[in-house]
Swiss-Prot record:
Expressed by the skin glands. The modification Phenylalanine amide is found at residue 65. Antimicrobial peptide with high activity against Gram-positive bacteria, low activity against Gram-negative bacteria, and moderate activity against fungi. Acts on bacterial biofilms (S.aureus) with the same potency than on bacteria. Acts by causing bacterial membrane disruption inducing leakage of the intracellular content followed by cell death. It adopts an alpha-helical amphipathic structure in membrane environments. Also shows highly potent antiparasitic activity against Leishmania species. Shows low hemolytic activity on horse and human erythrocytes (LC(50)=39 uM). This is Phylloseptin-S1. Residues 25-44 are annotated as: Disordered. Residues 23-46 form a propeptide. Residues 30-41 have a biased composition (Acidic residues). Keywords: Amidation, Amphibian defense peptide, Antibiotic, Antimicrobial, Cleavage on pair of basic residues, Cytolysis, Fungicide, Hemolysis, Immunity, Innate immunity, Membrane, Secreted, Signal, Target cell membrane, Target membrane. Residues 1-22 form the signal peptide.
Length: 66
């Protein structure tokens, strides 16, 4: 009977360890995705801030040739 208890505890322990590892990997993946989303948003903001400069540049070129 003691052998069965030890085996059962070993199986449960190994199951918990593998579950913990899977959850940690899942958390890391979610953090990487979140970081990627933040990078994409910051790139979009940088591009949007350049639009007024581009428009004014195009307008000045149009005046020069127009």
């Amino acid at each position: 009977m003691a052998f069965l208890k030890k085996s059962l505890f070993l199986v449960l322990f190994l199951g918990l360890v593998s579950l913990s590892i899977c959850e940690e990997e899942k958390r890391e993946t979610e953090e990487e995705e979140h970081d990627q989303e933040e990078d994409d948003k910051s790139e979009e903001k940088r591009f949007l801030s350049l639009i007024p400069h581009i428009v004014s540049g195009v307008a000045s070129i149009a005046k020069h040739f127009g």
